[in-house]
């Protein structure tokens, strides 16, 4: 088992000689632009509009959110994934978290790059970030993702139990998993997806790794994982806080073998 996070663009994956993935999983920018923190208390100092706007008001989460090229993303993700398996139940797949409004666009670009099939899935929260709109309208409390695959249905570990297309969005324990990214997905949620679509020893790749939570989830399940993060500060935070214990746990697993 190997865990590696690279401070580089996923387009440069060839220079690192990483293996092909059984599962590519990523959270693409939601194209919120300068409204990334809209309806969120963080728009204001200490979450109170009486204190005036904070430094996050009118800002994107990251500068890279402005120039994300989804066509290039799919082109390279197709190359990061393993080829279609001949045997049944071994095909790879890709999972993309995106906004509800982005789904038609993601499906369209996916088909252009060989991902002809998809399964939409949702995640139900018991809270909402849209606190400032709570007394004005119904607030969003759902996350969306698409399971994309080429021809054959992907590897599927259901333990002979039906798996529904909606999942619980269970927040991580802050004492165990640091929260270092504004759109960080819970490790518990990622682990559930990884264990469904991969086996122990398989490879998981996150092309836009952010906090590194995907890599941590894969590591905790005994999967090898590789990620790319171009923001230097986020890369450093992920290495220091999210993935600092990877070597220890990897060594323990290798010793057990």
Label every PLM stretch briefly.
Residues 1-228, 233-236:
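Core catalytic lobe of class I
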Residues 1-14, 239-257:
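S-adenosyl-L-methionine
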């Amino acid at each position: 088992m190997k865990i590696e996070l690279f401070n580089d663009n996923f387009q440069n994956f060839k220079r690192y000689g990483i293996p092909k993935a059984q599962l590519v999983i990523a959270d693409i920018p939601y194209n919120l632009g300068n409204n990334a923190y809209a309806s969120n208390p963080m728009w204001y100092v200490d979450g109170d509009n009486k204190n005036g706007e904070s430094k996050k008001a009118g800002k994107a989460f990251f500068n890279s959110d402005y120039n994300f090229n989804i066509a290039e993303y799919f082109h390279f993700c197709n190359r990061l994934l393993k080829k279609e398996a001949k045997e049944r139940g071994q095909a790879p797949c890709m999972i993309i978290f995106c906004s509800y409004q982005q789904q038609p666009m993601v499906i369209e670009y996916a088909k252009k790059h060989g991902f002809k099939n998809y399964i939409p899935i949702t995640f139900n929260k018991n809270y909402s970030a849209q606190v400032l709109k709570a007394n004005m309208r119904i607030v969003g409390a759902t996350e969306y993702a698409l399971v994309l695959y080429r021809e054959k249905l992907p590897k599927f570990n259901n333990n002979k139990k039906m798996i529904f297309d909606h999942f619980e969005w269970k927040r991580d324990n802050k004492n165990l998993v640091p929260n270092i990214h504004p759109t960080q997905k819970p490790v518990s949620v990622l682990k559930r997806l990884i264990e469904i679509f991969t086996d122990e020893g398989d490879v998981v790749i996150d092309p836009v790794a952010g906090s590194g939570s995907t890599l941590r989830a894969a590591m905790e399940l005994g999967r090898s994982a590789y990620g790319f993060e171009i923001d230097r500060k986020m890369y450093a935070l992920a290495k220091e806080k999210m993935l600092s214990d990877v070597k220890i746990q990897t060594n323990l697993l290798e010793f057990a073998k």
